[in-house]
Amino acid sequence: MAQGQSLQDIFLNVLRRERIQVSIYLFNGIKLQGHIESFDQFVIVLKNTISQMVYKHAVSTIVPSKFVSHYANNSSNYSNHSGDRN
């Protein structure tokens, strides 16, 4: 994955661009909800009624409110990494 964008960046960018509501679960069990306003290598800015800067090292899971096809516009960057070992 050295070439182009990382899978993480592609996924977060789709969520940001399409303003998809997300639930972000932190390692300490806290659940944050909103849409991703921006992100960089270290943080995600989540907006709901307020903006919150969340450090990525504290994030356990990001759950979109609807299906996200993060390969749709980036199929040339990645082969199928679905875990199939055929």
Curated annotation (Swiss-Prot):
Which biological process terms from the Gene Ontology are attached to this UniProt entry? regulation of DNA-templated transcription; regulation of RNA stability; regulation of translation, ncRNA-mediated
**UniProt keyword annotations, A-Z:** RNA-binding, Stress response
A GO molecular-function term, please? RNA binding
Q: Which GO terms describe its cellular component?
A: cytosol
PROSITE patterns (UniProt xref): SM
InterPro entries from the UniProt entry = Hfq (IPR005001), LSM_dom_sf (IPR010920), Sm (IPR047575)
CDD domains noted in UniProt = Hfq (cd01716)
Q: Which Gene3D superfamilies match?
A: 2.30.30.100
Domain of life of the organism in this record? Bacteria
Q: Where is the Sm domain?
A: 9-68
Give any Pfam family that matches: Hfq
S-S bridge residues: none
Subunit structure and binding partners: Homohexamer.
Similarity field: Belongs to the Hfq family.
Chain's role: RNA chaperone that binds small regulatory RNA (sRNAs) and mRNAs to facilitate mRNA translational regulation in response to envelope stress, environmental stress and changes in metabolite concentrations. Also binds with high specificity to tRNAs.
| Protein name per its UniProtKB record | RNA-binding protein Hfq
